[in-house]
């Protein structure tokens, strides 16, 4: 048997694949936009590496590369907005992720509307499905992993927005769009208080 192939008794074949590709299978939640406001400038970055860490208060872990313009802003101000775009914004979201706030006013360049938040200086994005105002509550993993722990402090949504499907990055320039919803709330007896 070759080392790159594993044959189980039931005839299922498995092959190895590069560890550098594991994130293609484990991409977490939907692609989001993270806004910051630093030194008089609002900025937007595209982000897909984030995860929920706690229900209440809502804690969100997110990775922001130290090479990103937003890293300095987030580290300096300790606040941001996580805006959740629907799939009708996918082209703009990808374009936002392919330029830098160092030299581009992304709100103007991509025709997005900044709106004032209630508890943070970073702006909401009016065109998004939802916006979560966040404050950085833990930076202990920033130096080693570029990971910020955020607490959601105020949340907004647009109930009249027609397009509500979000999308997920596969990490290779392809995306998966949310589709059919399967309602199994009745089975969630252990977590009923969170629904």
Describe every region a protein language model picked out:
Residues 7-195:
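Basic, polyanion-binding surface patches
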């Amino acid at each position: 048997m070759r080392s790159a192939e594993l044959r189980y008794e039931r005839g299922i074949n498995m092959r190895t694949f590069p560890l550098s590709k594991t994130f293609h299978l484990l991409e977490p939640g939907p692609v989001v936009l993270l806004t910051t406001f630093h030194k008089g400038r609002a900025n937007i970055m595209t982000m897909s590496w984030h995860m929920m860490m706690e229900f209440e208060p809502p804690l969100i872990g997110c990775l922001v590369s130290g090479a990103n313009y937003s890293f300095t802003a987030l580290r300096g101000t300790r606040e941001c907005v996580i805006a959740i775009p629907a799939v009708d914004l996918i082209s703009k979201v990808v374009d936002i992720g392919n330029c830098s706030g160092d030299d581009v006013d992304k709100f103007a360049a991509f025709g997005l509307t900044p709106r004032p938040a209630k508890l943070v200086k970073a702006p909401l994005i009016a065109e998004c499905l939802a916006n979560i105002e966040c404050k950085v509550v833990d930076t202990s993993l920033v130096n080693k992993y570029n990971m910020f722990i955020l607490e959601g402090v105020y949340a907004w949504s647009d109930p009249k927005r027609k397009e509500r499907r979000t999308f997920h990055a596969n990490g290779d320039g392809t995306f998966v769009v949310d589709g059919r919803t399967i309602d199994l709330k009745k089975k969630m007896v252990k977590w009923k208080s969170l629904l």
